[in-house]
Amino acid sequence: MAASEHRCVGCGFRVKSLFIQYSPGNIRLMKCGNCKEVADEYIECERMIIFIDLILHRPKVYRHVLYNAINPATVNIQHLLWKLVFAYLLLDCYRSLLLRKSDEESSFSDSPVLLSIKVLIGVLSANAAFIISFAIATKGLLNEVSRRREIMLGIFISSYFKIFLLAMLVWEFPMSVIFFVDILLLTSNSMALKVMTESTMTRCIAVCLIAHLIRFLVGQIFEPTIFLIQIGSLLQYMSYFFRIV
């Protein structure tokens, strides 16, 4: 994601510069040489608009975030990657604790230290399996072997849906919310992969689905009851919804 790697958010064509700055607060957005449209209109957008478009899975905003928003001249990409990995694992540990919290037997039978060790081992093992399987699937289905760090950075950035789990610190939600967050995480990862590889959406979904499925299966080795809790909560929520309708 060097400076020369800026992309037009509309067509994905490489552009040399996104804007010309005449004075502080006075800029002119550059046009793409391929589609003749403004290369990146998100430069002048508020962060809330960018966040909303990310939730809506718009390819334009994914190109903006993955290619144009990070300036390698001022940001250490390697440090950013490690920070994202730490945040990702931390939120994953919280997700695991939320699911275990609904399992009363596990919550009361395990000591805090033992529970922490179990959660940490489970999260690290599941995510190691996710990264390995994702790399293998990407190489096999998309023939992408030269941009592993860039692609993994994009996957961690597109996992922003995990921050919605923090809302469960304040408000009480059914455990099925975690299931919906996982689905949105899968679709967001697929969109980011499509934008970065310019492959078909079907192949990108297949890669992410394989990686997430293997991650889930490895996670079940350490806590097989979590899946039953999640599915049970989802079925309970759906039955309640249909009764209202």
Swiss-Prot record:
GO cellular-component term (any): endoplasmic reticulum membrane
InterPro entries referenced in this protein's UniProt entry, alphabetically: Arv1
Major location category of this protein: endoplasmic reticulum
Any one GO biological process: intracellular sterol transport
Membrane topology listed for this record: Multi-pass membrane protein
Pfam families per record: Arv1 (PF04161)
Keywords, alphabetical: Endoplasmic reticulum, Lipid metabolism, Lipid transport, Membrane, Sphingolipid metabolism, Transmembrane, Transmembrane helix, Transport
Tissue distribution: Restricted to tissues in which cells are actively dividing or expanding. Mostly expressed in roots and flowers, and, to a lower extent, in stems and leaves.
Keyword hit for Transport: yes
Disulfide-bonded cysteines: none
Compartments (UniProt record): Endoplasmic reticulum membrane
Chain segments annotated as transmembrane: 70-90, 117-137, 163-183, 200-220, 224-244
Membrane is among the record's keywords: yes
Family: Belongs to the ARV1 family.
Protein's job: Mediator of sterol homeostasis involved in sterol uptake, trafficking and distribution into membranes. Also regulates the sphingolipid metabolism.
Protein name: Protein ARV 1
High-level lineage: Eukaryota, Viridiplantae, Streptophyta, Embryophyta, Tracheophyta
